[in-house]
């Protein structure tokens, strides 16, 4: 049996925070605001995985009202989500992600992101696709106010 999940997330830029996307720290003058480390891509992937098994979203499992998750490493959160998915009897078919940002340029970091995500999801890098686009200076991402991301995951029963 196959299950498909979709995820979407956005985070606003702020001074004085590191920019972490896909488990990789990216040099930039601003980072993203969030209760955790605000890794917009890993949050999106977690939501897609949880959605595929009809288990809610990242906020249900790691609420921003819980101080235990303040400044949490999103890689650890995704590992916990993936462990839960595997306990339900699923493995990854493939994952396709899009980062939506005017700046910084993501291309130099995409292979590192793919590698890190493949490690977190215990799969071959060949099952992970990450791409990036801009909104041609339209909307909040185009005005460089934040970053958005989307992901689609295909899970299959073990």
From Swiss-Prot:
Q: Which GO terms describe its biological process?
A: isopentenyl diphosphate biosynthetic process, methylerythritol 4-phosphate pathway; terpenoid biosynthetic process
User: What terms describe the molecular function in GO for this protein?
Assistant: 2-C-methyl-D-erythritol 2,4-cyclodiphosphate synthase activity; metal ion binding
What are the binding positions for 4-CDP-2-C-methyl-D-erythritol 2-phosphate in this chain?
A: 9-11, 35-36, 57-59, 62-66, 101-107, 133-136, 140, 143
So, what pathway does this thing act in?
Answer: Isoprenoid biosynthesis; isopentenyl diphosphate biosynthesis via DXP pathway; isopentenyl diphosphate from 1-deoxy-D-xylulose 5-phosphate: step 4/6
Name the coenzymes or cofactors required: a divalent metal cation
Q: Where is this site: Transition state stabilizer?
A: 35, 134
What keywords would UniProt list here? Isoprene biosynthesis, Lyase, Metal-binding
Q: Where does a divalent metal cation bind?
A: 9, 11, 43
Reactions listed under catalytic activity: 4-CDP-2-C-methyl-D-erythritol 2-phosphate = 2-C-methyl-D-erythritol 2,4-cyclic diphosphate + CMP
Q: Where is the signal peptide?
A: none
- Can you tell me where the transmembrane regions are? none
PROSITE patterns given for it? ISPF
Q: Could you say which EC number(s) this protein's record lists?
A: 4.6.1.12
Q: How is the cofactor bound?
A: Binds 1 divalent metal cation per subunit.
Q: Mind telling me which Gene3D superfamilies this protein's record contains? A: 2-C-methyl-D-erythritol 2,4-cyclodiphosphate synthase (3.30.1330.50)
Q: Which superkingdom does the taxonomy of this entry point to?
A: Bacteria
Q: What family classification does the UniProt entry report for this protein?
A: Belongs to the IspF family.
Q: How does it assemble?
A: Homotrimer.
**Database matches in NCBIfam families:** ispF (TIGR00151)
The role this protein plays is: Involved in the biosynthesis of isopentenyl diphosphate (IPP) and dimethylallyl diphosphate (DMAPP), two major building blocks of isoprenoid compounds. Catalyzes the conversion of 4-diphosphocytidyl-2-C-methyl-D-erythritol 2-phosphate (CDP-ME2P) to 2-C-methyl-D-erythritol 2,4-cyclodiphosphate (ME-CPP) with a corresponding release of cytidine 5-monophosphate (CMP).
Return the protein name: 2-C-methyl-D-erythritol 2,4-cyclodiphosphate synthase
Say which species the protein is native to.
Bacillus cereus (strain ATCC 14579 / DSM 31 / CCUG 7414 / JCM 2152 / NBRC 15305 / NCIMB 9373 / NCTC 2599 / NRRL B-3711)
Lineage of the native species?
A: Bacteria, Bacillati, Bacillota, Bacilli, Bacillales
Q: What is the primary gene name for this protein?
A: ispF
């Amino acid at each position: 049996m196959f299950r498909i999940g979709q995820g979407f997330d956005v985070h606003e830029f702020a001074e004085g925070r590191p920019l972490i996307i896909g488990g990789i720290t990216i040099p930039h003058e601003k980072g993203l605001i969030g209760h955790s480390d605000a890794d917009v891509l890993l949050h999106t992937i977690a939501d897609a995985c949880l959605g595929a098994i009809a288990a809610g979203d990242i906020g249900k499992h790691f609420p921003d009202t819980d101080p235990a998750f303040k400044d949490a490493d999103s890689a650890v959160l995704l590992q916990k989500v993936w462990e839960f998915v595997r306990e339900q009897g699923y493995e990854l078919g493939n994952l396709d992600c899009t980062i939506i940002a005017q700046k910084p340029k993501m291309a130099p970091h995409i292979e590192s992101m793919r590698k890190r995500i493949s490690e977190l999801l215990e799969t071959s890098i060949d099952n992970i696709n990450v791409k990036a686009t801009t909104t041609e200076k339209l909307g909040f991402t185009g005005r460089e106010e934040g970053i958005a991301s989307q992901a689609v995951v295909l899970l299959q029963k073990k």
